């Protein structure tokens, strides 16, 4: 993931005493990293962007999008820091997919987070179990841009019911 590459670069920059400008120029060479100060933006009269051009040789002409293709391989912590006080969202959160198929014109996230990628039922179930066992939470918020569009929703819920039966499992959707 790009965060690790940026962190590694930052550690190298600190170790070698780089100035901020050198760090930013090096970071811009990592795929998926956009450094605004390394680009000149020109605008049309109506305020829309006319062009974006690099102002130094280290900045690529076009910044490539980076995505995590296989969500099953994304790091997910098995143990969380849990507060000692009651908080508003006193539950753990589990992401089941990224992206959205609907393509609503008003939704920026639906376009930015493409393509749609899903975790497998087994990975979701294992992560949910581990979260409950290691945090003491008895609620999990299953999240995504559109959870009801998860293609394996029914098998996922059936699998989770195997171990949540005495505790119950609820799913609320705005269309219900």
Residue ranges, per PLM feature:
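N-terminal [4Fe-4S]-dependent radical SAM core
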Residues: 42-93
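Flexible loop/turn segments at secondary-structure boundaries
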Residues: 2-4, 41-43, 83, 101-105, ...
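Beta-sheet entry/capping signal
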Residues: 32, 91-93, 103, 137-141, ...
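Glycine-rich beta-alpha loop elements in corrinoid/cobalamin-binding modules
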Residues: 1-56
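Canonical Radical SAM [4Fe-4S] cluster-binding loop centered on the CxxxCxxC motif
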Residues: 86-122
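Structured alpha-helical segments in the cores of large, soluble enzyme domains
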Residues: 3, 92-100, 124-132, 157-160
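Secondary-structure transition/capping motifs at alpha-helix termini
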Residues: 13-16, 114-122, 130-138, 159-171
């Amino acid at each position: 993931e790009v965060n690790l590459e940026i962190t590694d670069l930052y550690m190298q920059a600190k170790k070698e005493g780089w100035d901020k400008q050198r760090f930013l120029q090096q970071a811009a060479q990592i795929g998926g990293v956009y450094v605004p100060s390394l680009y000149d933006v020109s605008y049309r009269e109506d305020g829309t962007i006319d062009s974006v051009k690099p102002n130094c040789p280290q900045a690529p002409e076009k910044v490539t999008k980076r995505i995590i293709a296989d969500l099953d391989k994304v790091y997910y912590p098995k143990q969380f820091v849990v507060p000692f006080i009651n908080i508003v969202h006193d539950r753990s959160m589990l992401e089941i997919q990224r992206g959205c198929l609907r393509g609503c014109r008003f939704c920026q996230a639906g376009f930015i987070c493409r393509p749609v990628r899903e975790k497998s039922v087994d990975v979701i179930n294992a992560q949910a179990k581990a979260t409950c066992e290691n945090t003491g939470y008895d609620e999990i918020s299953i999240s995504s841009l559109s959870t009801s569009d998860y293609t394996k929703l029914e098998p996922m819920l059936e699998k989770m019911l195997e171990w949540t039966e005495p505790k119950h499992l609820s799913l609320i959707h705005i269309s219900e």
